[in-house]
Amino acid sequence: MSSNIFKRFKSAEESLDEDESVTPVYIPKAKRAKLEALKAKKSQIASRLSTHKQQSAPTTTTNTSTTASTTTTATTNNTNNSKPSIQTKKPTGKKFQFDWDVEEEDTASGFVPLIEMDEEIDDPLFSGQESTHWTNKNLEEMTDRDWRIFKEDYNITTKGKNIPNPLRYWNEGSINDKLVSIISQLGYEEPTSVQRASIPLALKKRDVVGVAETGSGKTLAFLIPVLNYILSIDENYLKYEKISNEPVGLILAPTRELALQITKEAEKFCKKLGYQVLPIIGGHHYQDTINKIDQTGVHLIVATPGRLVDSIERKIVDLSKCYCLVMDEADRMIDMGFEKDLNKVLDKLPTEKQLSSTIDGRIFHLEKRSTMMFTATISPTVEKLTKKYLIDPGYLYIGGAGEALDNISQSFEFLSSATTEATKFNKLIKIIRSHWRVTENPLIIIFANFKHVCDSLSQELSSNDINNVVIHGSKSQDMREQAITNFRNHESEVLIATDVAARGIDIPNVTLVINYQMVKKFDEYIHRIGRTGRAGNLGESFTFISDQDTEIFTPLKKFLKKGGKRLPDWLYKHQSQTVQE
């Protein structure tokens, strides 16, 4: 009730009561009772305030009675005398006159709350607003709000029914203890975002569609569920069938390089578990594959689609017991023309009917085939593949897949029609040497669109004392593998490559990507610069571009604007011209 008194506008009576310097005003008898009641309420409020203070009553309380007395006197004088006395203040020479020093006096220190409480108020408006962060809670203490914050922290978005909560720590999920131990031995401290999201869903034997960029930790995101599945298979079956040519798990990749990288990662686990992993890729003799299977058998195959189809047709491998499938970079497999081969492979896999009508259901502890698909984008073809071969999948979107890469600085050099090839190459030399001066342990990838351009660049760089290696489609598999090994080990600090050869290469410490020739499809630009700035590191890209690349300008403009990047002048001018047209 007291708050209403102080919030309303002051009447003439109140103004008179508070300021002795104003001219007394006659107060009708009918209003005097109301004024006295108002004074009484003020006195009560002042009394309440004083009980909560440890010091003497404030001056304003004393002034109330003084003011009241003055007001009464002034009123009496106004009644008895025809000319009321007017109180005036001595002029100070200031434009504005106050009863206090504006610069020195501060009333904030005199604030005393009406009620002081040490205990928290049980207010329903604040219920559920917990102050404890999820990192300080046990798993069973996590609330829905905690999980929402968790997903925001790790840029995880999900779509689908009954998606389980992400994985916080390796030892909190339903991962086999043997795998948890190996993960610790190999030095994987915490899961990445894609691993946190996909592993719990896959361990529920749900189909998974993961939308994430290369370099986000996808390999371990599908290896852990695959190996966890193999560990759940009947031990007697694995013991007696391990020397057969019937793998129980299959991982498909678009390129030989990516398949070899996945194989290398899988071998770290399989050697400790006693499992056999085998790559089936082009460039290797069929007889070598046959000999390997005859000697050790195979549990897990990592393959490219085309080579695997040939191996199936030659009866080298049999997929009739393969109930666990992974498709890595599915969008790239389709873009590279493997859709037909991919469908052939998937049609060779066992069905749910085989699980329910044979002993396989008890051996493999499954009711349906388990499929995981990872892709950078969901194209119509990928969506069609998903609907045909996956059952009720959960969709996982990790980070900014398909969006601008915030941790990569993107620079451009616009070349006029008068720019010679020699001028362009000299600029390339300056960029490389400048990067070397300011970067510790630099690794540079140079992309070109044609094999002969790669070879020419290699020769010119070598003549300028820049050690480099080259990979493209005309290089043998052994030469490509050796080139990547030399680059990875810093024996050569520059790798020159075409898009197809470099697709899927995962070298974590690439510091600079140079597009010597701009791509014809914009998606390839994203894949190229995505070779740097991996695993949270910062990266740089430099692109030579000219009027011959105008078909890329519009998607490039949208890409840069979406990521909050500054548009180069030449691209901004192109935008203006487009709008005017």
Curated annotation (Swiss-Prot):
Coiled coil stretches, renumbered: none
GO-annotated molecular function: ATP binding; ATP hydrolysis activity; mRNA binding; RNA helicase activity
Residue ranges, annotated region (Disordered): 1-24, 41-93
Residue span, Helicase ATP-binding domain: 199-396
InterPro entries: DEAD/DEAH_box_helicase_dom, Helicase_ATP-bd, Helicase_C-like, P-loop_NTPase, RNA-helicase_DEAD-box_CS
Positions bound to ATP: 212-219
Domain Helicase C-terminal: 424-575
Residue numbers covered by motif Q motif: 168-196
Catalytic activity: ATP + H2O = ADP + phosphate + H(+)
Matching Pfam families: DEAD, Helicase_C
Keywords, comma-separated and alphabetical: ATP-binding, Cytoplasm, Helicase, Hydrolase, mRNA processing, mRNA splicing, Nucleotide-binding, Nucleus
UniProt-annotated location(s): Cytoplasm; Nucleus
Main location: cytoplasm
Motif (DEAD box) on chain: 328-331
EC number, UniProt record: 3.6.4.13
GO biological process, one term: mRNA splicing, via spliceosome
Free-text function comment from the UniProt entry: ATP-dependent RNA helicase involved in mRNA splicing. May destabilize the U1/5'-splice site duplex to permit an effective competition for the 5'-splice site by the U6 snRNA, resulting in the switch between U1 and U6 at the 5'-splice site. May also act to unwind the U4/U6 base-pairing interaction in the U4/U6/U5 snRNP, facilitating the first covalent step of splicing.
Family: Belongs to the DEAD box helicase family. DDX23/PRP28 subfamily.
Subunit structure: Component of the U5 snRNP complex.
Domains: entry comment: The Q motif is unique to and characteristic of the DEAD box family of RNA helicases and controls ATP binding and hydrolysis.
Protein name: Pre-mRNA-splicing ATP-dependent RNA helicase PRP28
